[in-house]
Structures are given as C-alpha cells and as structure tokens.
Design a protein with these regions (language model features):
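Rossmann-fold cofactor-recognition segment
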Residues: 58-80
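Substrate-binding pocket helix/loop in short-chain dehydrogenase/reductase
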Residues: 110-128, 132-137
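Flexible N-terminal pre-Rossmann segment of NAD(P)-dependent oxidoreductases
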Residues: 1-15, 129
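Conserved glycine-rich cofactor-binding loop
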Residues: 13, 20-22
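Conserved glycine-rich Rossmann-like NAD(P)H-binding loop of the short-chain dehydrogenase/reductase
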Residues: 36-51
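A glycine-rich helix->loop->beta "capping" turn
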Residues: 63-68, 88-101, 106-108, 129-132
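The beta1-alpha1 cofactor-binding region of Rossmann-like NAD(H)/NADP(H)-dependent oxidoreductases
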Residues: 45-46, 72-85, 133
C-alpha cells in the first residue's frame, strides 16, 4: 500500500500496541516507510512474525527500501511484562518517540445484542442484565488500562 504523504521520521522510534491487527499494522507500515524504527507489540508471536514479514516485504516491493519493523510478544495489561518489553525495545531500537496505543477489543459476554432495552426484550439472554461481569472487566482492562 502506498502512503499518500511524505514525512521524515528518520531516527525516530515508534511503538505500536495492537500492531498485528489490521488498522495498527497499517499505521506501523506508514511509520516505517517514513523512516521510523517500529516496534509492534501484540500477544500472538506467529501473527506478529507474519505481520512484520509482510510489512518488510511490502516496503521492499513498493518503495525499494529496507525498513526496521520488529515484533514483541506482550500482553499490554500485564505491567511487568510491558515494562520488560519496553526495556528490550529501548536496547534494540532506542527510546520511544512515537506511541500508538492501538491494543483493544471486545468479548462475547461483555456485549448485548440489543441496542435499546425494551420491556419485551428484558429477559433476553443478551440484554444488559445478563452481561458477564468478568468479561466486562477484561474488556475494560484491555481497552482502558492497557493504554
């Protein structure tokens, strides 16, 4: 994918959480082809490896340039794990200049299938009253505490 703008980020280090997902991998690519060294943080090592390989190959094909993109497996809601990952990133790529907190998601059990509560749907299995408190907490931890 060609980036429709030019920005010189040479010498900058960017960290992108949730970077193996569709949106954040595109952001990571834009940063990398603009010259930044990019650390992608995600939970799934295989997915990270696939995304980093794809971004590196795309940059060679589309821009005839080498980019620096590295994947780091980490759960952003585990502060100790996150701090360890950051120390590794700092030693390999340098201190963070650009941070994109893109990790996030949702889970069944934390959402309803009904947009508005109506009396006749009050007892539905997927209403507000049947939400799973633990799933809601997991989603909040990821989407709020993880950023």
């Amino acid at each position: 994918m060609k980036i429709p703008f030019k920005v010189d980020l040479t010498g900058k280090t960017a960290i992108v959480t949730g970077g193996s997902g569709t949106l954040c991998s595109a952001m990571a690519y834009g940063l990398a082809v603009s010259g930044a060294k990019v650390a992608i943080i995600g939970r799934n090592k295989d997915k990270l490896n696939n995304v980093t390989d794809e971004l590196i190959n795309n940059a060679k094909t589309e821009y005839s340039k080498d980019i620096v993109v590295k994947g780091y497996s980490c759960n952003v809601i585990d502060k100790e794990e996150l701090n360890k990952s950051y120390e590794i990133i700092k030693s390999e790529l340098g201190s963070c200049d650009i941070l994109i907190n893109g990790a996030g998601g949702n889970q069944p059990g934390a959402i309803t299938s009904i947009e508005m509560l109506k009396k006749e749907k009050e007892d539905s299995d997927y209403s507000f009253w049947n939400l799973d408190e633990d799933r809601i907490r997991d989603v909040m931890d990821l989407n709020y505490m993880g950023t």
